[in-house]
Amino acid sequence: MKNMLILLLVVSASIGASAASGTPAVRPNILYLIADQWRASATGYAGDPNVKTPNLDRLAKDSLNFRNAVSVLPVCTPHRAALLTGRYPTSTGMFLNDAHLPDQELCMAEILGAADYATGYIGKWHLDGHGRESYIPPERRQGWQYWKAAECDHNYNHSHYYTGNSDEKCYWEGYDAFAQTKDAQKYVREHAANGRPFVLMVAYGVPHFPHKTAPEEFKGMYPPEKIQLPPNVPPALQARARQEAQGYYAHCTALDKCIGELLDTLAATGLASNTIVVFSSDHGEALGSQGVAPTQKQVAWSESAQVPFLLRFPGIAARTVTTPITTPDILPTLLGLAGVDRPKTIEGQDLSPLLRAGRDEDRAALYMCVSPFANVPREKLREYRAIRTSRYTYVRGLQGPWVLYDDVNDRFQTNNLAGNAESAALVQELDGRLQAQLKRIGDDFRPGKDCLAEWGYEIGAHGSVPYAATLTKVQTPQRKATKSPITTPARKEAP
């Protein structure tokens, strides 16, 4: 059945390519670089006074720099599922870490593969749910052909991976990001010769903790006592925040070096002029901000939810983009830029017309926490639905409006306007925009325990799917009958 549906995609793509006037004469390559836990503020071009990111700063000057990009659910697995499917966590059930992305979900590599793209994946996967060290066979790779990846490994030095059709463990040489970059460079060079468009996703594991695993030469660049903390880190967390920030920034600068090498390879092979380059992250990290312990995310504040998002596309002038974007918007936008038809399953919105026209739009980018987990106090982390606009962050909890920040005038989100009488009209307006987004995707915002029951999850003590090196019980979200059934688009159908 799946093979038949992919065949239908191929036929549809062929017809669409010949009929669509907006299809490029030569489809662009796509190089997608995704870091793990890199918050939006932690770059030189974003104004961080500590971190050294000369290569990303260079890329930013040539790119569309999205200043209001958010992770739809700021945790690893949910973001990655939304990125590859263009669908929201409440529609796929992928709102916990270590769940298995259902095989019937139509994903990025299958869509682009049907349009004759070569597809390659290097690095962290975290969508298989069979255990963090388990082999992922080709039929569970969602269309990625070239494969050097593993489910999840938080070591970052000599980490394991699998390649091809072999279940034999391999190990990256030295610091993972350096070795993964060399492999990505090799992939680019090989595909420069054959002329076939490719999509290559390089999914790095850093700067996710443990921060101490960063190379010593980079840690030496960041003495903890010299690190400047933002004003929203309370005194009780400042010492630890500086210690963690040393390794965090070291990982960032090491990865910046890798990105520079890949950009140079694109230029040397002549592919830079026809390659979409994206740099982003699956979510951010608190690092003590808002009183949330270093290493944590999932909370609604910008340090957790806002991510860097640079998109370099030949023919579109570099600029700062104020239009908000959320994870499910990324896939349809890339398809729009590449001239590939958008499948009906996708819920995100295609922003490519705005980008081509050089226009901005004050839209509401939706993000959420469906069922909280991790060791974060519930006054900081609870079920929420939120929107990011060009100016505001508005967050609603189950009991009503929770927080409202003016991000233009309150960069560090220290002044909550939600309870102010003078902000009542603004709260009402933003709540209406939030409710419109929820209605569009059929999300009736219920308690997390109800969502867990709806999707048939069995959770562990930490509130999420139990994880281990290998698992005998794989948890694949499957929606059950509820009191208020929600209709979702059919999966794996042709565009």
Question: Residue ranges of each PLM-predicted region?
Answer:
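Formylglycine-dependent sulfatase
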Residues: K2, L7-L9, I15-G397, W402, ...
